Amino acid sequence: MKKILERSMEGSGTWQGLVLVGIVTWICASSYLKFTHKFRSLLQPWVARQVVGGVPLILRIQKCQNGVLDAFFSGLSCVVSVPFYTAFLPLLFWSGHGRLARQMTLLIAFCDYLGNCIKDVVSAPRPSCPPVRRITATKDEEDNAMEYGLPSSHTLNTVCLSGYLLHYVLSSLEYESVSIQYYGFALACLLVALIAFGRVYLGMHSVVDIVSGLAIGVLILGLWLTVNEKLDDFITSKQNVSSFWTALSFLLLFAYPTPEHPTPSYEYHTAFNGVTLGIVTGVQQTYSQFHHEAAPRIFSPELPISSYLGRVMVGIPTILLVKFCSKSLAKWTLPMVSNALGIPIRSSMYIPKLKGYASGKKTDEPKNSVGYLQKLCEFLSHDSFDIDTGIRFFQYAGLAWSVVDLVPSLFSYVNL
């Protein structure tokens, strides 16, 4: 048995190293060979023509506009948005459904990363407004409108998450029921259809965006249903998980493609990348205590609704406090570390004194004193790095870690 475990650990370390080396190789090769620019020059003109050609169909759909439909589709878009899922995930973890919550977190992160990468590689426009009427009922929708169009993230996410949730529910049933499978599948398809139609009705996407989001979502869902059990087993029971995921998260920040013009997509990815790291490291450390399959679940005698509401009342203020503290700590430490390592930095939001310029070594110092990290910056065509990326990453990593580690420890302490 001991030899088997040792071989498993060696094999795990080998593929982890290969994954990280592969990402580093991709970063260097794509930067040097300008893959993003080449892919964009091939895809963007065709997609732009499809978007322009789809405007008459959008206008015909919007002829049936009224206040009820505006409110319905706007509300539906909010319910299936990434911020909504992010707010919902802590409640799912605290309800005792740890495996479902882990898989939903990782799946959202994967969909968000891949979808936003494709958006920024293609850099295809959304339908022109006017003549299309674009409805942005919330600040989140206004931010979404600033992103590129293809693929539709709402459609992609809905396909993946509703499909996985259906799979989870059906696999959890004690007996198979054809009628439950049929109605569950029909309900998932109805939700996807409403989301897809709503994105066109709201003027946020053209048909080509919807179709691409649907196709990519189906491919991701098929892949996820194949690997989800192995991935969950790796996170909960293997070695080097935290160190591997930390390195992976760091490299994914560099592997993200550069869009034609800046959009909020990279900020969304950074935040959820931090969330994923916090969840993975926290679960890996406390799985046997709080997140195992025998953990009490909501509505069971061990976790009645009153205790669950108590968890929510304790947990929500705690994670918000941790987020604030993580942000403050990152704002204090990251600039000092960057300056000590000779990394040129700037801030567009969090640190006013760094706005609009790079801070680092003085310009009259010899150039060979900046070290390899600054040479890496120059190789990746960055004059400086936005320190806000690191601050955003660490505050969301701290928030997510508190959801699965600190807060469950508090629950145990106060008998919730």
Curated annotation (Swiss-Prot):
EC number(s) reported in the record: 3.1.3.-
Residues annotated as catalytic: H154 (proton donor), H205 (nucleophile)
Transmembrane segments: 72-92, 104-124, 178-198, 207-227, 241-261, 266-286, 302-322, 393-413
Name of a matching Pfam family: PAP2
Keyword match Amino-acid biosynthesis: no
Annotated site residue numbers, Stabilizes the active site histidine for nucleophilic attack: D209
Record's keyword terms, sorted: Endoplasmic reticulum, Hydrolase, Lipid metabolism, Membrane, Sphingolipid metabolism, Stress response, Transmembrane, Transmembrane helix
Region of interest (Phosphatase sequence motif II), residue spans: 151-154
Topological relation to the membrane, as annotated: Multi-pass membrane protein
One annotated Gene Ontology cellular component of this protein: endoplasmic reticulum membrane
Region described as Phosphatase sequence motif I: spans on this chain: 119-127
Subcellular location(s) of the protein: Endoplasmic reticulum membrane
Region entry Phosphatase sequence motif III, spans: 198-209
The UniProt record lists the keyword Hydrolase: yes
GO molecular function terms noted in the UniProt entry: hydrolase activity; sphinganine-1-phosphate aldolase activity
Family annotation (InterPro entries): P_Acid_Pase_2/haloperoxi_sf, P_Acid_Pase_2/haloperoxidase
Example of a GO biological process term: response to abscisic acid
Gene inactivation effect: No visible phenotype under normal growth conditions, but mutant plants show increased sensitivity to ABA in stomatal closure and decreased sensitivity to ABA-induced inhibition of primary root growth.
Function, in words: Functions as a sphingoid long-chain base phosphate (LCBP) phosphatase. May play a role in the regulation of LCBP levels and be involved in stomatal responses through LCBP-mediated ABA signaling.
Family designation: Belongs to the type 2 lipid phosphate phosphatase family.
Protein name, per record: Lipid phosphate phosphatase delta
Organism the protein comes from: Arabidopsis thaliana
Gene label: LPPD
